[in-house]
Amino acid sequence: MIAEIISIGTELLHGDIVDTNSAYLAEKLTGCGIDVHYISTVGDNKQRLYKTLQQAVERADLIITTGGLGPTMDDLTREAISEITTCPLVMRPDLVIDIEGYFNHKRTTMTPNNLKQSYLPEGAIPINNPVGTAPGILLEKDNYIIISLPGVPREMKIMFEESVLPYIKKKNNLMIISKELHFIGIGESTLETKLEDIMDSMNPSLALLAGDGEVKLKITGKGRTKKKIENKISEIVKTVRNRVGEYIYGEDETSLPDEIGKLLSKRGVTIALAESCTGGLIGARITDIPGSSAYFKGGVIAYSNEVKINHLGVNKNTINKEGAVSPETAAEMASGVRQRLEADIGLSVTGIAGPEGGTDEKPVGLVYVGLAGIDGEVKTYKLNFKGDRNKNRWLTTQSAFYYLYRYLKFSFK
Amino acid sequence: MIAEIISIGTELLHGDIVDTNSAYLAEKLTGCGIDVHYISTVGDNKQRLYKTLQQAVERADLIITTGGLGPTMDDLTREAISEITTCPLVMRPDLVIDIEGYFNHKRTTMTPNNLKQSYLPEGAIPINNPVGTAPGILLEKDNYIIISLPGVPREMKIMFEESVLPYIKKKNNLMIISKELHFIGIGESTLETKLEDIMDSMNPSLALLAGDGEVKLKITGKGRTKKKIENKISEIVKTVRNRVGEYIYGEDETSLPDEIGKLLSKRGVTIALAESCTGGLIGARITDIPGSSAYFKGGVIAYSNEVKINHLGVNKNTINKEGAVSPETAAEMASGVRQRLEADIGLSVTGIAGPEGGTDEKPVGLVYVGLAGIDGEVKTYKLNFKGDRNKNRWLTTQSAFYYLYRYLKFSFK
């Protein structure tokens, strides 16, 4: 089955918003074994919308549109589909009731233009919209299927998951299964070299995705039976784990803070943070995880030297002699926060995020991470980043998590 | 001038990555007064890429492609342009030198396939790539211009800004100027009602963009002279400021932490944070701003009650009697951090982010913000959010910034 995705809305052609709907739909369709050949974006312009739809029904089996289903004059999707499919728009009394019900429930007044949304091309099946007024459209013709969803991502996604996905799965019985392996502490090119001989494998296929200071390997298999595809994927995973297993920190939907949370819970220990250049970002990422209060005590954002001295117990002489950005300060911060917040583990970072504050000796991007373990012993790590402020701060959190993860995973007695 | 944007790459059709390049280019082109009629995405497939390009040169004056310029066999953009324009590919000795130079500089070995990137369609001008090996292509034909840029956003953006934008501005002399007003403390629909009579204005046009707990108004004017457009925009801005000026916190590229930073600097005062449910996210956002060390002392991430008591001086009885999520605790947290970190202002948040931890009396989404002013007086604010954990945490930071901003702007003596 060949699919085409069409995003409708002038705001997309102005670049006011990024079209995330298409990537979402493309991923879901690919996951069902459907080949997406084209993604098109077109504005709220009658003529160009017709042309784009006409072309799509000629070259694809399944056309999914998003946007242009609202009640205003700009919303042209309904009319365009009616025209292209030669199915006249007819009012659906059941939809009138739904739309009136929606406004009653919200206790707001319905304006007459909302009734436009109760018209569908003849023969179309309305797709229920549990979170808005615009119903979707599903229309089967001899050679193609058109599905129209609203442009608001939240509405589109709920309707796709609840109604469209089950329908498509029935129509198309080729299955695609993917598995993701998450790596930390190894670069994309090194990984590619180590896996060179299997990277070209066709089924399952392998793809490396790098970004945000880590690398993912996506393994995708196609077939008719789940069992067979999963077996093929397992074989690849086994090969990869044999070669570079020590750099894999997780599979599928996960993140470093997620895996660290699991390890801390499993070992029944708590952690506290002392953050300088990250200003709270490590804490924000740790507490992103629901239930993190079980192992996260809290932290000190020690942005000024006073706070480092008064609230973490860093020695004034250490800062004067070695500087606030030094392994010695990082070590005292980690020890200090561990003791003062009565945690089992203390993690600290101090560095120069930029753009100001760098010197020849201590350039922008220099960062020290301190890790005080459960026995009180402290290790420090030196890092040199080359990014801008944002990137340096993010990579600092990634590195801190990396050392913490390895400590919890491998060095913990 | 009518433009079309084409994104090339199978990874886009799989939904592995979201196409942010097109929105970036669309915004820049719109800003130059160029109408973008279509955005298309096509995979690394010869036949479909040719068709898409052929169609584009027939209906647009300016075609910008991204992706498919790399050295591998999958990269087909160069060949496709050569075919469509009937300009044969010729090797450019100057580009060979550039590419060899790039590898020498990086001290890595050049593989022969990299030389593919030294071939350009005859008559094309290479676009310098300061951060990678793939040069871009600029080819002027009688009826259209094709510009090809790499798909890596960082490379694409630098090349667009440095080389393409100046070229396009010369070619097209209609000007578009935009101004953005940032609102906080007023909802999209209220704002729309208050501006109803001017929302339909054509030139300048007005658009409301809501998201992330705030609303933006984008005012866009078109014309031939800068002065005239700016005057028209100024009139609209004046009208808007007269009606809803108190909710405007900034113009154009800015953010709440940015404006708060400016106010703190201007007034020469410092701030400290006591964060519970946000776990460091407020600090992370404040320290996103370069130079924030001038006014940000630091903070305490008081995730556990122990930390609230021992490191912020919250009274144990307050927590036992009123609970950790209460106006009383928020007030003591704000006072405590202000005193202990010797800051002029203390800002605190405590709440239930979810998904667990809610009760009938104190449901998920209940948050208290505490603000201890320069005179030591404390105010607290109650909030009820209805989102998931992520959204509740983000909206908590937005609200805390809102109260802080209003304090600094209006109540400060």
From Swiss-Prot, chains A, B:
SUPFAM superfamilies: CinA-like, Molybdenum cofactor biosynthesis proteins. It comes from Halothermothrix orenii (strain H 168 / OCM 544 / DSM 9562). Coiled coil: none annotated. This is Putative competence-damage inducible protein. CDD domains: cinA (cd00885). Pfam families: CinA, CinA_KH, MoCF_biosynth. HAMAP family: CinA_B (MF_00226_B). Disulfide bonds: none annotated. Belongs to the CinA family.
